[in-house]
């Protein structure tokens, strides 16, 4: 599985893939999870945070999207700032070096697979790889509270921004996660991700920071 970076600079190269991506989001969030407020007549799940500022990481295997994630600069409107501000006691994070992660998914047929690294781990490691590459120092995430131990177990330093609250019947919290070398190397080693996975097609002009030396621990 390779993870493609899609930004405003190369979005035209991925028009067809993005169309599939938004339809997969509809299937997962509207049909499977029942978020009917996101339903649209065109069968795509697109919200107010799918702007030109959004960055998409799409995991592709044999030309099929199997995992995805959206990243939004916290200097722009985010889920935390505009929908769930009550989850951050000190107010939503707004920093040029921090992005919000959202719409993180793996398609049903790839969930829980055991042949090699799981798609879930690859897409999350790709987020850390992207953050390091462009010089970020933090991610914010609005998530169901049961996710917290899993983040810690994969080597991420996740700090709650407030107290968990019941949202639509689910205990939900907001966290800030450090983006650093240890977080990327940690998830790769703990989840058997074999190093860098990002494809920067059409983004050759983007200045990227070097990644730390990586060695798989067997």
Swiss-Prot record:
Induction: Repressed by RpaR in the absence of 4-coumaroyl-homoserine lactone. Induced by 4-coumaroyl-homoserine lactone. Keywords: Autoinducer synthesis, Quorum sensing, S-adenosyl-L-methionine, Transferase. Its EC number is 2.3.1.229. It catalyses: 4-coumaroyl-CoA + S-adenosyl-L-methionine = N-(4-coumaroyl)-L-homoserine lactone + S-methyl-5'-thioadenosine + CoA + H(+). One of its GO terms (biological process) is quorum sensing. Coiled coil: none annotated. Gene3D superfamilies: 3.40.630.30. InterPro entries: Acyl_CoA_acyltransferase, Autoind_synthase. SUPFAM superfamilies: Acyl-CoA N-acyltransferases (Nat). GO terms for molecular function: transferase activity. Catalyzes the synthesis of 4-coumaroyl-homoserine lactone, a quorum-sensing (QS) autoinducer molecule which binds to RpaR transcriptional regulator to regulate expression of QS-dependent genes. Belongs to the autoinducer synthase family. This is 4-coumaroyl-homoserine lactone synthase. The lineage of its organism: Bacteria, Pseudomonadati, Pseudomonadota, Alphaproteobacteria, Hyphomicrobiales. The gene is rpaI.
